């Protein structure tokens, strides 16, 4: 009986959040270990389906770096990187687009639909969703000057046309977006999935942006999790070394989304089963929230 009461209390704890977020959009970046582990894939799918059933509109943006690396290796294509960004020539871009849109996207869509959802896969090329220009990577030279390096078909988003997403949401579907955009000449561009999630969230004026990662969240210099960060405090946390390395672009993506009209951004450990539900529907939450 005690366990049953605990379950009832959990449902009651979720009630005000269900009421608050019903009818709202939540953009979720899906990547990392959560895409590789079978139990986590199932819990992700069930979380997303539950959101839709209770009136919340989830929009998914997925990554696919490990799958791209594996396929490039199979084709004998060796990648170069500039400041962590893959140099993407035409041959590499062909593989990237094939893997993201033809393999990973369909797997994510299939898993959600297999468990009772109604997901639809698309890329940034569909409906003119993500318009891009070539991203020139800035590299600091030995003399201290900054050089802009052409890294191929890597895109910087210039415009988001969310019409197709709004249409899918209204029809009861869950959009699943592969991070491939289109240039003015119709050429394909590989885009950082975190960047796509942030830009899409801003375009939709989403209630929340959630980034699923392979870390618990942002930690202070003693290694303790920071459960909440104010937008105004982010520059100082970067300057003093609290936010470092690969966490900087993720936090920057969140801050850009907040300044674009998103209400809250969250960096959450995707290795935790039902991480999405725990963040949205519990008083304590998990991970780090960034507040505008």
Curated annotation (Swiss-Prot):
Subcellular location(s) per record: Cytoplasm
Protein's GO biological process: arginine biosynthetic process via ornithine; L-arginine biosynthetic process
Molecular-function annotations in GO: acetylglutamate kinase activity; ATP binding
Biological or metabolic pathway of the protein: Amino-acid biosynthesis; L-arginine biosynthesis; N(2)-acetyl-L-ornithine from L-glutamate: step 2/4
Gene that produces this protein: argB
Site (described: Transition state stabilizer): 29, 250
Superkingdom of the source species: Bacteria
Function per UniProt: Catalyzes the ATP-dependent phosphorylation of N-acetyl-L-glutamate.
Family: Belongs to the acetylglutamate kinase family. ArgB subfamily.
Its EC number(s): 2.7.2.8
Alphabetical UniProt keywords: Amino-acid biosynthesis, Arginine biosynthesis, ATP-binding, Cytoplasm, Kinase, Nucleotide-binding, Transferase
Protein name: Acetylglutamate kinase
First-listed, main subcellular location of the protein, grouped into a coarse class: cytoplasm
Ligand binding (substrate): 64-65, 86, 190
Organism, scientific name: Geotalea uraniireducens (strain Rf4)
């Amino acid at each position: 009986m005690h366990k049953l009461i605990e379950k009832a209390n959990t449902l009651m704890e979720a009630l005000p959040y269900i009421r608050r977020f019903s009818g709202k959009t939540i953009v979720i970046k899906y990547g990392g270990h959560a895409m590789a582990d079978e139990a986590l894939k199932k819990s992700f799918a069930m979380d997303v389906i539950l959101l839709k059933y209770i009136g919340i509109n989830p929009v998914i943006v997925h990554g696919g770096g490990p799958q791209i690396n594996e396929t490039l290796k199979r084709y004998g294509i060796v990648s170069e990187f500039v400041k962590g960004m893959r140099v993407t020539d035409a041959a590499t871009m062909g593989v990237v687009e094939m893997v993201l849109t033809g393999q990973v996207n369909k797997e994510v869509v299939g898993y959600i639909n297999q468990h009772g959802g109604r997901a639809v896969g698309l890329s940034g090329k569909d409906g003119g969703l993500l318009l891009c220009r070539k991203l020139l990577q800035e590299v600091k030279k030995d003399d201290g000057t900054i050089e802009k390096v052409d890294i191929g078909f890597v895109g910087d988003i210039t415009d988001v046309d969310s019409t197709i997403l709004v249409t899918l949401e209204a029809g009861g579907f869950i959009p699943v977006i592969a991070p491939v955009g289109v240039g003015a000449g119709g050429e394909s561009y590989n885009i950082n999935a975190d960047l796509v999630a942030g830009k899409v969230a801003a375009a939709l004026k989403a209630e929340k942006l959630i980034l699923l990662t392979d870390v618990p969240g942002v930690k202070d210099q003693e290694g303790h999790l920071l459960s909440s960060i104010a937008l105004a405090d982010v520059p100082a946390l970067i300057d003093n070394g609290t936010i470092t390395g690969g966490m900087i672009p993720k936090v920057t993506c969140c801050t850009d989304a907040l300044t674009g009209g998103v209400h809250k951004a969250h960096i959450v450990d995707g290795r935790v089963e039902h991480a999405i539900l725990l963040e949205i529907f519990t008083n304590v939450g998990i991970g780090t929230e960034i507040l505008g």
